Protein backbone atom coordinates (compact mmCIF):
# COMPACT_ATOMS: atom_id res chain seq x y z
CA UNK A 1 0.00 0.00 0.00
CA UNK A 2 2.82 2.41 0.81
CA UNK A 3 4.45 1.78 -2.57
CA UNK A 4 1.19 2.24 -4.39
CA UNK A 5 0.47 5.36 -2.36
CA UNK A 6 3.90 6.79 -3.13
CA UNK A 7 3.50 5.97 -6.80
CA UNK A 8 0.08 7.62 -6.89
CA UNK A 9 1.39 10.66 -5.06
CA UNK A 10 4.34 10.99 -7.45
CA UNK A 11 2.04 10.60 -10.46
CA UNK A 12 -0.34 13.19 -9.08
CA UNK A 13 2.50 15.57 -8.42
CA UNK A 14 3.78 15.10 -11.95
CA UNK A 15 0.33 15.72 -13.40
CA UNK A 16 -0.10 18.75 -11.20
CA UNK A 17 3.29 20.07 -12.29
CA UNK A 18 2.49 19.52 -15.95
CA UNK A 19 -0.89 21.15 -15.48
CA UNK A 20 0.73 24.06 -13.68
CA UNK A 21 3.32 24.42 -16.42
CA UNK A 22 0.60 24.36 -19.07
CA UNK A 23 -1.42 26.89 -17.14
CA UNK A 24 1.63 29.06 -16.63
CA UNK A 25 2.54 28.80 -20.28
CA UNK A 26 -0.98 29.69 -21.34
CA UNK A 27 -1.10 32.58 -18.89
CA UNK A 28 2.30 33.81 -20.01
CA UNK A 29 1.18 33.64 -23.62
CA UNK A 30 -1.93 35.61 -22.84
CA UNK A 31 0.15 38.10 -20.86
CA UNK A 32 2.71 38.59 -23.59
CA UNK A 33 0.00 38.83 -26.22
CA UNK A 34 -1.80 41.46 -24.15
CA UNK A 35 1.44 43.28 -23.56
CA UNK A 36 2.22 43.19 -27.26
CA UNK A 37 -1.21 44.53 -28.19
CA UNK A 38 -0.89 47.22 -25.53
CA UNK A 39 2.53 48.16 -26.83
CA UNK A 40 1.22 48.58 -30.37
CA UNK A 41 -1.65 50.63 -29.06
CA UNK A 42 0.63 52.85 -26.99
CA UNK A 43 3.07 53.27 -29.85
CA UNK A 44 0.24 54.21 -32.16
CA UNK A 45 -1.14 56.72 -29.72
CA UNK A 46 2.30 58.07 -29.02
CA UNK A 47 3.00 58.40 -32.73
CA UNK A 48 -0.26 60.17 -33.30
CA UNK A 49 0.41 62.46 -30.39
CA UNK A 50 3.96 63.02 -31.60
CA UNK A 51 2.76 63.83 -35.11
CA UNK A 52 0.18 66.17 -33.70
CA UNK A 53 2.74 67.77 -31.42
CA UNK A 54 5.22 67.99 -34.27
CA UNK A 55 2.61 69.63 -36.46
CA UNK A 56 1.75 72.02 -33.68
CA UNK A 57 5.45 72.71 -33.21
CA UNK A 58 5.92 73.25 -36.91
CA UNK A 59 2.95 75.60 -36.95
CA UNK A 60 4.41 77.53 -34.06
CA UNK A 61 7.83 77.57 -35.66
CA UNK A 62 6.37 78.69 -38.99
CA UNK A 63 4.35 81.39 -37.30
CA UNK A 64 7.33 82.52 -35.26
CA UNK A 65 9.51 82.48 -38.36
CA UNK A 66 7.05 84.62 -40.30
CA UNK A 67 6.74 87.12 -37.51
CA UNK A 68 10.48 87.09 -37.04
CA UNK A 69 11.11 87.86 -40.72
CA UNK A 70 8.64 90.72 -40.62
CA UNK A 71 10.22 92.04 -37.47
CA UNK A 72 13.70 91.74 -38.93
CA UNK A 73 12.64 93.46 -42.14
CA UNK A 74 11.05 96.31 -40.24
CA UNK A 75 14.07 96.54 -37.99
CA UNK A 76 16.44 96.60 -40.97
CA UNK A 77 14.40 99.35 -42.61
CA UNK A 78 14.57 101.33 -39.41
CA UNK A 79 18.32 100.73 -39.20
CA UNK A 80 18.72 101.84 -42.83
CA UNK A 81 16.81 105.04 -42.11
CA UNK A 82 18.77 105.66 -38.94
CA UNK A 83 22.08 104.87 -40.65
CA UNK A 84 21.27 107.21 -43.53
CA UNK A 85 20.24 109.97 -41.17
CA UNK A 86 23.43 109.42 -39.20
CA UNK A 87 25.51 109.56 -42.39
CA UNK A 88 23.79 112.78 -43.45
CA UNK A 89 24.37 114.41 -40.08
CA UNK A 90 27.97 113.20 -39.99
CA UNK A 91 28.66 114.57 -43.47
CA UNK A 92 26.90 117.86 -42.73
CA UNK A 93 28.86 118.31 -39.49
CA UNK A 94 32.08 118.49 -41.52
CA UNK A 95 30.83 121.54 -43.42
CA UNK A 96 31.08 125.20 -42.47
CA UNK A 97 27.56 125.59 -43.81
CA UNK A 98 25.24 128.58 -43.61
CA UNK A 99 21.68 128.06 -44.82
CA UNK A 100 20.31 131.26 -46.36
CA UNK A 101 17.29 130.14 -48.37
CA UNK A 102 15.71 132.59 -50.79
CA UNK A 103 12.19 131.73 -51.97
CA UNK A 104 12.65 133.60 -55.25
CA UNK A 105 15.33 131.11 -56.28
CA UNK A 106 13.00 128.08 -56.03
CA UNK A 107 11.56 126.95 -59.38
CA UNK A 108 9.79 123.69 -58.54
CA UNK A 109 10.13 120.37 -56.77
CA UNK A 110 13.05 118.01 -57.34
CA UNK A 111 12.67 114.70 -55.53
CA UNK A 112 15.39 112.07 -55.36
CA UNK A 113 13.92 110.27 -58.40
CA UNK A 114 14.95 113.25 -60.53
CA UNK A 115 18.42 113.82 -59.12
CA UNK A 116 21.14 112.82 -61.61
CA UNK A 117 23.92 115.42 -61.77
CA UNK A 118 26.11 117.72 -59.71
CA UNK A 119 27.04 120.70 -61.90
CA UNK A 120 30.15 122.68 -60.91
CA UNK A 121 30.45 126.39 -61.70
CA UNK A 122 32.81 129.32 -61.13
CA UNK A 123 31.40 132.63 -59.95
CA UNK A 124 33.87 134.48 -62.21
CA UNK A 125 34.27 137.04 -59.46
CA UNK A 126 36.06 137.53 -56.16
CA UNK A 127 33.04 138.42 -54.03
CA UNK A 128 32.33 136.06 -51.16
CA UNK A 129 29.36 133.70 -51.16
CA UNK A 130 26.97 135.93 -49.23
CA UNK A 131 27.66 138.82 -51.58
CA UNK A 132 27.08 136.55 -54.56
CA UNK A 133 23.70 135.44 -53.20
CA UNK A 134 22.66 139.02 -52.53
CA UNK A 135 23.75 140.00 -56.03
CA UNK A 136 21.68 137.23 -57.58
CA UNK A 137 18.62 138.38 -55.68
CA UNK A 138 19.16 142.04 -56.54
CA UNK A 139 19.42 141.27 -60.25
CA UNK A 140 15.86 139.96 -60.36
CA UNK A 141 16.88 137.26 -62.82
CA UNK A 142 15.96 134.54 -60.29
CA UNK A 143 19.16 132.69 -61.20
CA UNK A 144 21.05 130.87 -58.44
CA UNK A 145 22.91 127.70 -57.56
CA UNK A 146 22.10 125.57 -54.53
CA UNK A 147 25.54 126.09 -52.92
CA UNK A 148 28.39 128.62 -53.09
CA UNK A 149 31.82 127.58 -51.78
CA UNK A 150 34.12 130.34 -50.52
CA UNK A 151 37.89 130.27 -50.94
CA UNK A 152 38.26 129.70 -47.18
CA UNK A 153 36.08 126.58 -47.31
CA UNK A 154 32.92 128.09 -45.84
CA UNK A 155 29.69 127.39 -47.74
CA UNK A 156 26.37 129.18 -48.21
CA UNK A 157 23.27 127.26 -49.29
CA UNK A 158 20.46 129.36 -50.74
CA UNK A 159 18.22 126.67 -52.29
CA UNK A 160 17.15 123.40 -50.61
CA UNK A 161 18.39 120.28 -52.38
CA UNK A 162 14.88 119.00 -53.05
CA UNK A 163 14.04 122.15 -55.05
CA UNK A 164 14.90 123.22 -58.59
CA UNK A 165 17.34 126.11 -58.99
CA UNK A 166 18.13 127.91 -62.25
CA UNK A 167 21.90 127.48 -62.40
CA UNK A 168 22.59 125.53 -65.60
CA UNK A 169 20.51 127.50 -68.09
CA UNK A 170 20.00 126.31 -71.64
CA UNK A 171 22.14 123.46 -72.92
CA UNK A 172 23.31 122.58 -76.39
CA UNK A 173 20.57 121.44 -78.77
CA UNK A 174 19.77 117.80 -78.08
CA UNK A 175 21.36 117.75 -74.65
CA UNK A 176 18.06 117.12 -72.91
CA UNK A 177 17.95 113.75 -74.64
CA UNK A 178 21.70 113.12 -74.49
CA UNK A 179 21.78 113.68 -70.73
CA UNK A 180 18.44 112.03 -69.99
CA UNK A 181 16.82 115.20 -68.64
CA UNK A 182 13.80 115.49 -70.93
CA UNK A 183 11.10 116.25 -68.36
CA UNK A 184 10.93 120.01 -67.84
CA UNK A 185 7.33 119.97 -66.60
CA UNK A 186 8.28 120.47 -62.95
CA UNK A 187 10.20 123.66 -63.74
CA UNK A 188 8.24 126.89 -63.71
CA UNK A 189 10.25 127.95 -66.76
CA UNK A 190 9.79 125.32 -69.45
CA UNK A 191 12.72 126.38 -71.60
CA UNK A 192 10.81 126.69 -74.85
CA UNK A 193 12.57 129.92 -75.89
CA UNK A 194 16.06 129.12 -77.23
CA UNK A 195 18.98 131.50 -76.82
CA UNK A 196 20.25 132.45 -80.26
CA UNK A 197 19.02 129.15 -81.68
CA UNK A 198 21.88 127.12 -80.21
CA UNK A 199 20.56 126.44 -76.73
CA UNK A 200 17.06 125.01 -76.94
CA UNK A 201 17.26 122.55 -74.06
CA UNK A 202 16.59 123.58 -70.47
CA UNK A 203 16.21 120.28 -68.59
CA UNK A 204 19.43 120.12 -66.58
CA UNK A 205 18.10 122.36 -63.80
CA UNK A 206 15.33 119.85 -63.07
CA UNK A 207 17.79 116.99 -62.53
CA UNK A 208 20.77 118.53 -60.79
CA UNK A 209 22.42 120.26 -57.86
CA UNK A 210 24.37 123.41 -58.74
CA UNK A 211 27.57 124.34 -56.90
CA UNK A 212 29.34 127.65 -57.49
CA UNK A 213 32.97 128.10 -56.43
CA UNK A 214 34.23 131.60 -55.77
CA UNK A 215 36.89 131.79 -58.47
CA UNK A 216 38.04 133.85 -61.42
CA UNK A 217 39.35 131.87 -64.35
CA UNK A 218 43.08 132.37 -64.93
CA UNK A 219 43.70 133.57 -61.38
CA UNK A 220 45.54 130.41 -60.34
CA UNK A 221 44.63 127.15 -58.68
CA UNK A 222 41.73 126.78 -56.29
CA UNK A 223 42.77 127.00 -52.61
CA UNK A 224 43.08 123.66 -50.82
CA UNK A 225 40.51 124.74 -48.21
CA UNK A 226 37.98 125.37 -50.98
CA UNK A 227 38.68 122.05 -52.68
CA UNK A 228 38.47 120.11 -49.42
CA UNK A 229 35.17 121.83 -48.66
CA UNK A 230 33.94 120.80 -52.11
CA UNK A 231 34.98 117.20 -51.37
CA UNK A 232 32.96 117.24 -48.17
CA UNK A 233 30.01 118.94 -49.83
CA UNK A 234 29.82 116.24 -52.51
CA UNK A 235 29.94 113.61 -49.76
CA UNK A 236 27.05 115.39 -48.05
CA UNK A 237 25.00 115.49 -51.26
CA UNK A 238 25.65 111.77 -51.84
CA UNK A 239 24.54 110.98 -48.28
CA UNK A 240 21.43 113.15 -48.62
CA UNK A 241 20.22 111.27 -51.69
CA UNK A 242 21.63 107.87 -50.78
CA UNK A 243 23.45 107.51 -54.10
CA UNK A 244 26.16 109.16 -56.18
CA UNK A 245 25.25 111.70 -58.84
CA UNK A 246 27.37 112.21 -61.95
CA UNK A 247 29.72 115.19 -61.64
CA UNK A 248 30.08 117.56 -64.59
CA UNK A 249 31.05 121.20 -65.06
CA UNK A 250 28.91 123.90 -66.63
CA UNK A 251 30.63 123.92 -70.01
CA UNK A 252 29.94 120.19 -70.38
CA UNK A 253 26.25 121.07 -70.49
CA UNK A 254 26.64 124.20 -72.58
CA UNK A 255 29.68 124.61 -74.80
CA UNK A 256 31.09 128.10 -74.85
CA UNK A 257 30.77 128.57 -71.10
CA UNK A 258 34.02 129.32 -69.33
CA UNK A 259 33.37 127.41 -66.12
CA UNK A 260 34.96 125.55 -64.72
CA UNK A 261 38.29 127.12 -65.62
CA UNK A 262 41.26 125.36 -67.19
CA UNK A 263 43.06 125.11 -63.86
CA UNK A 264 40.21 122.93 -62.58
CA UNK A 265 40.43 120.32 -65.34
CA UNK A 266 42.64 117.89 -63.40
CA UNK A 267 40.45 118.23 -60.32
CA UNK A 268 37.35 117.56 -62.43
CA UNK A 269 38.79 114.32 -63.77
CA UNK A 270 39.63 113.26 -60.22
CA UNK A 271 36.08 114.06 -59.06
CA UNK A 272 34.65 111.93 -61.83
CA UNK A 273 36.94 109.06 -60.83
CA UNK A 274 37.18 109.30 -57.04
CA UNK A 275 34.75 112.08 -55.97
CA UNK A 276 37.75 113.86 -54.42
CA UNK A 277 39.86 116.66 -55.85
CA UNK A 278 43.02 114.55 -55.65
CA UNK A 279 43.82 111.32 -57.48
Spans of features found by a protein language model:
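Low-complexity, intrinsically disordered or signal/transmembrane-proximal segments
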Residues: 1, 13-15
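N-terminal targeting leaders characterized by basic, low-complexity, disordered sequences
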Residues: 1-2, 7
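N-terminal, positively charged topogenic segments adjacent to a membrane insertion site
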Residues: 8-12
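Bacterial N-terminal signal peptides that target proteins for export
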Residues: 20-32
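Hydrophobic membrane-insertion alpha-helices, especially the h-region
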Residues: 33-38
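Basic/polar, cationic surfaces and motifs that engage anionic cell-wall
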Residues: 45-88, 199-210, 214-279
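Active-site-adjacent loop/helix surface patches within enzyme catalytic domains
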Residues: 88-110, 117-241
Amino acid sequence: YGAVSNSFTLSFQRQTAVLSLRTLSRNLGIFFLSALVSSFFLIGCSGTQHDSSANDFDDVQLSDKTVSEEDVQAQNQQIDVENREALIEEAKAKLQLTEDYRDDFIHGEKGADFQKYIVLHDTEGSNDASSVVNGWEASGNLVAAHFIVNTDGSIVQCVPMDKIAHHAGFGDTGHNIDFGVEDESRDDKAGTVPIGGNFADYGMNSYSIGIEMVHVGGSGDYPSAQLEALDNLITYIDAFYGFQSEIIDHKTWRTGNSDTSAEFSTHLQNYKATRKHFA
